[in-house]
From Swiss-Prot:
Gene: cotG
Name of this protein: Spore coat protein G
Taxonomic lineage: Bacteria, Bacillati, Bacillota, Bacilli, Bacillales
Compositional bias (Basic residues): 31-163
Region (Disordered): 1-163
UniProtKB keywords: Repeat, Sporulation
Length: 195
């Protein structure tokens, strides 16, 4: 005889009563305790299975949450590092720009100072040239003045001496009123006699 459940036996008894088997006594099988134990075991197993399943699900969900948490953390880290790298790139670019600007500004200042020094040097050279030419001109002018003065003095000396004798006839002195004139070159020379 195979194993039947309690509900199957009850249905069999009911059908026997309907058919006329009134003296049939329903007897529960002797293996009730064992079946109860088995059911208890299966119930325990199912409970443990449920627990293990729940714990498995929990562990899986925990793993998932942990992985997602790790992913989110790694994403945050990567995002932060990306932001940092972008900011670093920006700062590096700005630093490079500032360095290039400083270099260009220095070169511009140098070129301006060089231009100024070149202009001042040119001015000083032109000033020196003008000063030298002025000195040369002044020297030549002084020399010409000296030569002119010398020639003028020599001319005065040459011209004054006979002219002085020519003007003596105008003066009233102790000479005789008789005067003799003769031409000596370009000037009239007066010959006077005493009284």
């Amino acid at each position: 005889m195979g194993h039947y459940s309690h509900s199957d036996i009850e249905e069999a008894v009911k059908s026997a009563k309907k058919e006329g088997l009134k003296d049939y006594l329903y007897q529960e099988p002797h293996g009730k305790k064992r079946s109860h134990k088995k059911s208890h075991r299966t119930h325990k197993k199912s409970r443990s299975h449920k627990k293990s399943y729940c714990s498995h699900k929990k562990s899986r969900s925990h793993k998932k949450s942990f992985c997602s948490h790790k992913k989110s953390r790694s994403h945050k880290k990567s995002y932060c590092s990306h932001k940092k790298s972008r900011s670093h790139k920006k700062s590096y670019r700005s630093h490079k720009k500032s360095r290039s600007y400083k270099k260009s500004y220095r070169s511009y200042k140098k070129s301006r100072s060089y231009k100024k020094s070149c202009r001042s040097y040119k001015k000083s050279r032109s000033y020196k040239k003008s000063y030298c030419s002025h000195k040369k001109k002044s020297r030549s002018y002084k020399k010409s003045c000296r030569t002119h003065k010398k020639s003028y003095r020599s001319h005065k000396k040459y011209y004054k001496k006979p002219h002085h004798h020519c003007d003596d006839y105008k003066r009233h002195d102790d000479y005789d009123s008789k005067k003799e004139y003769w031409k000596d070159g370009n000037c009239w020379v007066v010959k006077k006699k005493y009284k």
